Amino acid sequence: MLLAFDTATPFVTVALYDADDDGVVAERRSEQRMRHGEQLAPLIEQVLTDGGIVRQDLTALAVGVGPGPFTGLRVGLVTARTLAFVLEIPVYGVCSLDVVALEAALGSSPVGRDFVVATDARRKEVYLASYDDQGRRLDGPDVVRPAEAATDAPVAGEGAVLYPDAFPDGRSPVLPSAAWLARAVAGELAELHDPEPMYLRRPDAAAPGAPKRVL
């Protein structure tokens, strides 16, 4: 059994995947924005209960590595590393934009051509990457202002919802799905990473540095 979760967006998504049956056993998403630290553990327990298993039945973990806000990413990655250590099972990281791309390309409403994934990077910017019609990444991810990346190509992800003038051809999904994160790992459909955060810029909250010298 593979447990997958992503905390790179304002919502937490968790899924349980049975590789033997090639199917999603259970999936849940948080109902409230943010509060990742309060919501992730209960969602994991709910998914395990839905699947009728306990943690010791897990054989692997999958976690979204971003890019995304520092606080949310840290919650998911620390949880993944801790569980993997305690249970002595492997943990695989996947770029959260790749997860969105796989569902856009291979899900129930496939884009059918090259497309872009744009997610909210705050500060009126987006995380952006381009993909082929099978969801394979061609370029990126980068952090850019929407106006600088405006395109008529299909755009999956929350960026198309937030900036429709720059990305008028919005496609689903808007957010990454833990079910597709699990499929990405189980089927080796995306590049696998260590469970370390994918940052494209410094976190908003940074430790103060040494005082600057003054003449």
Predicted features along the sequence, with ranges:
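Oxyanion-binding and handling regions
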Residues: 1-24, 31-38, 92-215
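Short, well-ordered amphipathic alpha-helical segments that serve as non-catalytic structural scaffolds
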Residues: 36-51, 97
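N-terminal, well-ordered alpha-helical segments
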Residues: 38, 42-45, 77, 81, ...
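Phosphate/pyrophosphate-binding loops at sites that engage ATP/ADP/AMP, CoA/4′-phosphopantetheine
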Residues: 44-60, 108, 150-153
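DPxDG-like acidic metal-binding loop motif
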Residues: 60-90, 96
